[in-house]
């Protein structure tokens, strides 16, 4: 991200030096790249030369909405409690009636911003769990002071029970300490907080996907790329992320916006990319994903580029 920012800045400087005036240079110097800074993070804004002249804003809007609809999926993939923790903290942040200038509230605000940025309670890069600099007593009092309708309660659950369920995940350093554990000699699946395997050991997961592979297949798919592996009645089974499967409510909305984007695609190549991506979301078939990826790589002419879908495997 930082490298891209530098390149954009250099491009803007070159444009200014070639044909701009001193006034233009002065205006460029006044641009504030920093949005906000907290914890170990700095949020930046940057210029996109030519954006105002772009005629494809409708396409960008549709693609952006498709991405936003998948935000909660990412939170859930990063940890099974992330969404409920985020929603509980957001309820406190927006509805708290106490003093919002206290260190406890201010530190909770920083913690929530880190959760927003990292899509969960673990660091986006180091994957270690955040240490909250506010007290359990403060948060419990704040939660219990809210209308129960504002809280992410399970059916029949009370606010006290919500605190009992989520507080160890937030405050106990021994509970889910790493989103991704890579320590030698440990079960990397059981000891990682990410939500791709539920009650499954590393050996069980490796054996499951090994048995699926066809040694004669010269173009194998990325097994497990778009699914969660769980145990049901003692038997391993995949919950595929697709329309009609896991995350269907969010994926249906993603598909809705992608179909909007499909109708205003820049060219036939880009339209083919979007069409195939929609097909992948609808079928969950990893062969469709491979075909989508090939079409995406081949599209070298579209001015608007985007990535949407289950495309990474290091989370």
Tell what function each PLM region has.
Residues 1-4:
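Positively charged n-region of N-terminal signal peptides that target proteins for export
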Residues 6-12:
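Sec-dependent N-terminal signal peptides
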Residues 14-17:
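C-terminal motif of bacterial Sec signal peptides marking the signal peptidase cleavage site
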Residues 19-21:
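Bacterial signal peptide processing site
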Residues 28-239, 243-263:
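N-terminal helix-rich structural modules
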Residues 271-276:
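Short, charged, amphipathic alpha-helical segments
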């Amino acid at each position: 991200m930082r490298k891209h920012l530098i390149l954009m800045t250099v491009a803007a400087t070159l444009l200014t030096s070639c044909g701009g005036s001193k006034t233009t240079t002065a205006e460029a110097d006044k641009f504030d790249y920093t949005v906000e800074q907290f914890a170990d993070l700095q949020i930046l804004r940057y210029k996109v030369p030519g954006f105002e002249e772009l005629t494809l804003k409708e396409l960008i809007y549709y693609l952006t909405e498709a991405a936003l609809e998948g935000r909660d999926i990412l939170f859930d993939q990063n940890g099974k409690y992330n969404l409920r923790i985020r929603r509980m903290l957001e309820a406190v942040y927006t509805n708290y009636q106490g003093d919002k200038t206290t260190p406890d509230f201010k530190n909770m605000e920083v913690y929530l911003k880190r959760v927003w940025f990292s899509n969960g309670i673990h660091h986006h890069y180091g994957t270690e769990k955040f240490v909250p600099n506010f007290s359990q007593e403060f948060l419990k009092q704040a939660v219990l002071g809210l209308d129960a309708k504002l809280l992410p309660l399970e059916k029949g659950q009370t606010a006290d029970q919500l605190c009992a369920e989520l507080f160890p995940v937030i405050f106990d350093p021994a509970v889910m300490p790493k989103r991704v554990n890579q320590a030698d000699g440990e079960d990397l699946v059981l000891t990682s907080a990410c939500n791709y395997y539920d009650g499954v050991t590393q050996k069980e997961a490796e054996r499951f996907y090994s048995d699926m592979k066809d040694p004669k297949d010269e173009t194998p798919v990325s097994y497990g790329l778009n699914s969660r592996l769980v145990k049901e009645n003692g038997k391993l089974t995949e919950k595929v992320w697709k329309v009609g499967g896991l995350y269907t409510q969010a994926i249906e909305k993603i598909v809705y916006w992608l179909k909007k984007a499909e109708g205003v695609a820049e060219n036939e190549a880009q339209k083919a990319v979007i069409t195939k991506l929609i097909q992948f979301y609808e079928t969950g078939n990893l062969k469709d994903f491979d075909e989508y990826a090939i079409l995406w790589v081949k599209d070298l002419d579209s001015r608007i580029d985007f990535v949407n879908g289950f495309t990474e495997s290091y989370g």
